[in-house]
C-alpha cells in the first residue's frame, strides 16, 4: 500500500502495520479529567475522538493491528517515581495533585475514571491494550517485543497529546527502526495551537510522516487495496 503523506508518500504493508491509539483516556479527552483540571483546553477533543473511531474501524476492517495505550500509575504512585525521578518534578498530573491534595489518588490512577479509556473508544477482541508509566510507549513496556513478534514495523499514530506522548513514542520508535506516521486530524496537542504545529513539523522533517484520517481510510479500503495490487 502507498499512503499519501508529507513530506512524501510512504509504502506500508497492512500485515506489518499497527494503528496506535495514544492515551485516549478521560484524563486527556474529557472535561473534569487531568488535563482539564491542570488548566489545558480539552474543548476540541470531540472531533478528534470521532476521527480516531473512524480510523480504528477502517484499520480493523483491513486487518491492521490496533493497539491502545493507557498512561498512568498504580494508586500509590510508586510507578510514577519519587523525588529522585524527573517525572516527579515535570509531570503536570503529579504537580496538580501536590497543589490540590484532594485530587491525590484520582488523577491517572489505575482503576479510576480518569485512567479509563473514553466510552467512545473501547477495545474489541483482537485489540491490544498496553499500560505505560511515562510519555513514551516504549519505556518499561512490552511494546517493542510485541511488535517484533508480530512482524510489525510500521506504526500509524493517533491520540493525545501530539507534542508529548504521541511524539515521544514516535521518536523512540524511529530509534528502534520503526516507520512512524501521524494522522494529524486524529491527534490533539496539550497547550497552544503552535505546539501541534511544532510537533507535526518535527515529525515530518526529522522522524516520520504526516497524513490524515480520510487519506488513511481511503488507502486501506478494500477497493483501494485491489486497485493497488492489480
UniProtKB/Swiss-Prot annotation:
Enzyme Commission (EC) number: 3.5.1.110
Domain of life of the native organism: Bacteria
Enzyme class: hydrolase
A Pfam match: Isochorismatase
Active site: 23 (proton acceptor), 132, 165 (nucleophile)
Alphabetized HAMAP family for the sequence: RutB
Protein name as it appears in the record: Ureidoacrylate amidohydrolase RutB
Amino acid at each position: 500500500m502507498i499512503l499519501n503523506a508529507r513530506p512524501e508518500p510512504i509504502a506500508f504493508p497492512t500485515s506489518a502495520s499497527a494503528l496506535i491509539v495514544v492515551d485516549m483516556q478521560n484524563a486527556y479527552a474529557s472535561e473534569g479529567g487531568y488535563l482539564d483540571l491542570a488548566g489545558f483546553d480539552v474543548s476540541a477533543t470531540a472531533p478528534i475522538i470521532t476521527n480516531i473511531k473512524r480510523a480504528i474501524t477502517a484499520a480493523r476492517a483491513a486487518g491492521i493491528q490496533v493497539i491502545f495505550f493507557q498512561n498512568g500509575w498504580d494508586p500509590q504512585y510508586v510507578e510514577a517515581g519519587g523525588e529522585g525521578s524527573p517525572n516527579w518534578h515535570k509531570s503536570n498530573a503529579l504537580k496538580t495533585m501536590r497543589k490540590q491534595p484532594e485530587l491525590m489518588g484520582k488523577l491517572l490512577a489505575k482503576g479510576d475514571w480518569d485512567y479509563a479509556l473514553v466510552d467512545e473508544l473501547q477495545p474489541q477482541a483482537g485489540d491490544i491494550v498496553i499500560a505505560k508509566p511515562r510519555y513514551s510507549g516504549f519505556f518499561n513496556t512490552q511494546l517493542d517485543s510485541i511488535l517484533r513478534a508480530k512482524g510489525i514495523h510500521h506504526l500509524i499514530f493517533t491520540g493525545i497529546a501530539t507534542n508529548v506522548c504521541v511524539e515521544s513514542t514516535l521518536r523512540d520508535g524511529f530509534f528502534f527502526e520503526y516507520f512512524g506516521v501521524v494522522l494529524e486530524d486524529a491527534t490533539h496537542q496539550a497547550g497552544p495551537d503552535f505546539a501541534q504545529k511544532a510537533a507535526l513539523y518535527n515529525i515530518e522533517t526529522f522522524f516520520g510522516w504526516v497524513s490524515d484520517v480520510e487519506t488513511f481510510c481511503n488507502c486501506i479500503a478494500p477497493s483501494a487495496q485491489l486497485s493497488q495490487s492489480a
